[in-house]
Amino acid sequence: LLYIFMHIIIYLHYKKQVMKNGRLVKETAALQQFLKIKRELHIRHTIPLIEFSGAASPMVLGFFCPVLVLPEGEYSEKELYFILKHELVHVKRGDVYWKLLFMTVNGVHWFNPLIWIMQKEAAMDMELSCDERVTQGAGLEMKKAYTETLLSTLHKGCGKSIVLSTG
C-alpha cells in the first residue's frame, strides 16, 4: 500500500506543477491539428493542451479530466501531428486506467517478480499498440517520418516518468 500511496502522491504533485507552471497552447495551427485528430478519433470531451518545461516527453495526465502535456520546444507540423495522435490514442483507449490497475496489482503483489515484469511488458505493449494505430494505413515514408519523430522525442527527453501517465 505504501507503493501505491507514494505513486499517487508523486502523480498529484506532478499534475499540480503542470497546472500551475504550464501554459495553455494557443497557437492556431497546433490547436487546429489537435481538434482535427480529436474528431478523427471521435474524442468529444475537452482535453487541455499544455506546454510544460518540466515534462521529459509528451504525456497524458488525468483520469476524469485528462490533460495532454507537451515539453517546451519547437515541433514541425508532422512531429506535432504524430505526437498529438499518439497521445490521443492513449486517451481514446483509456490507457491511464490500465496503468492504474497495473500499479495497484504491483502494490498488492510487490513480492512477485512476475508482476513487475508483467507491468513493464504491458506498458511497452501499450506504447507499441499506439504506434501501430498511429501508422495504420500509412505508407513507408509516413512510417519513416513517425520513427524519426519517436527518435527525436526520445533524444530530447530521457527523464523520469510518472507511473500514472501515458507517453
Q: Which residues does each predicted region cover?
A:
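Hydrophobic topogenic segments
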Residues: 1-167
